[in-house]
Amino acid sequence: MRAWLNGDLMADPTQAAVAVTDHGFTVGDGVFEAVKTVHGRPFALTRHLERLERSAAGLGLPVPDLDDVRRGVEAVLEGEGEDAPMGRLRITYTAGPHPMGSGRGGGPPTLVVAWSEIHPAAAETTVVTVPWTRNKHGATAGLKTTSYAENVIALAHAVERGGSEAVFANTAGNLCEGTGTNVFYVVDGELRTPSLASGCLAGVTRGLVVEWCGAREVDEPLSEVLAVASEAFLASTTRDVQAISRWDDRDLPAPGPVTRQCAETWAAREAETMEP
């Protein structure tokens, strides 16, 4: 792993360096991005940084210096990252040191860019619907914040039941998203995915799949989706297009014909440019 903190490459990323009063640490007052790298080159970095700005604005944080973020990305990828077939960048931007509690003080924000090598995701996976819901009207709906406790609990619930991802409905009972993925499904040959109005995150991979594969954005009850979908897949930065072979107690073709075409389209378009 390599890490860059507030302008400096860290000699040892495992050593304590962020203030214990950092609001990102104490109350989850921060935003982040996870960016895939391919042989040391970040994929769709500009799109990720645009979302970082939107999330920061939604949380009321100062506007991040994106040139500074890019310098951090270059620093952690130089050398080691270039030799790795696949890696993950984690860009974390927090409110910085503040008084204990929810109230903010006047501390400067904290910016961390970290990178580590990862392995490609499996071609297919299983998912579990969880009993908790996403609040599409919540203050942080659609923002990629560091407040991930809800996702940790949901993912643990899914893993205990043999899944690699948890799937949420929203408070209206409609399909929303996974803990770190967007969900696509097929009905009567048509590719569909929940709209952003459902409260799901505007995933970078989601947006590209919608553009490249022509998915229709529609909000439907999760129970109906599970009953009628002929195939389904997850989309995320590190999973790309990953077929769902089992959803709760239902087996699905993995990949089905539409999922296979989406995966092939994704691979071809990704190979064309690193800044789609």
PLM region spans:
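Ordered, amphipathic secondary-structure segments that act as subunit-interaction surfaces
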Residues: 82-93
